[in-house]
Amino acid sequence: MIPTMNRDPRALRPQAFGSRRVKDVSDPVIEPAWDGVRVLAHLDVAAARAAIRDSSGDDLTRDHAPIAHALLAALAADSAIVDGYLTDQATRASEGRAIVTSEIPSLSEHTSQFFLGQHGSELLGGRGRPGRTDLGRAADEKERLEDAPIAFVAVDLVELDGEPLFEIPLLERKRLLESALGEGDLVRRTPYVREPAGTFIITWRSFGFGGLAYKAANSRYLPGSANDDWCMTPMPRR
């Protein structure tokens, strides 16, 4: 059983989305909107301690001990607080099915690995679609993934090595997150794009996402408060 952190992380809550319209978000970073439980992961590698807290401050660490261990193993820093979601959406079969039937030629190997993992991505051809002889294997993979595990999908970096990042612009926090947190079966980083995002939005819609998150590239992090530089919108139908 992984020990939880000594300091009380309950005072820190995730930043909430505001009510601003999408068109009013300046220079947006666009992400798929994740279904799942919003959490902050408090990680201390030196002490081998982690705490995963939801937006109410409840401790979910023991319920998700494998994810806590995976987060500590993935962190290339002494400590961090990472904003993310506990979700099966990154690993479940509905997204996998969308990948193997996608007609979007630009689907990358990284995107395939994000949703299916290394084994699942081996089913796909170089352009993100299986060859004709792979369709049976893809169906077997879909069935295998019906009971997909919950993973942690990181969306933001709140603190790094004891230094709060509240005043650092979002895009820079994203870059720090990419450097600080590796990926694996139970730890992912959300994909994000800048405008124009039409092709990526089509891809995310085909994966089964129901909405999009728009976040100003220069936005700061307001823990526990709503920030109008962040907004959610339903997935466009076309």
What annotation goes with each model-predicted range?
Residues M1-R238:
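Catalytic cores of nucleic-acid ligases and guanylyltransferases
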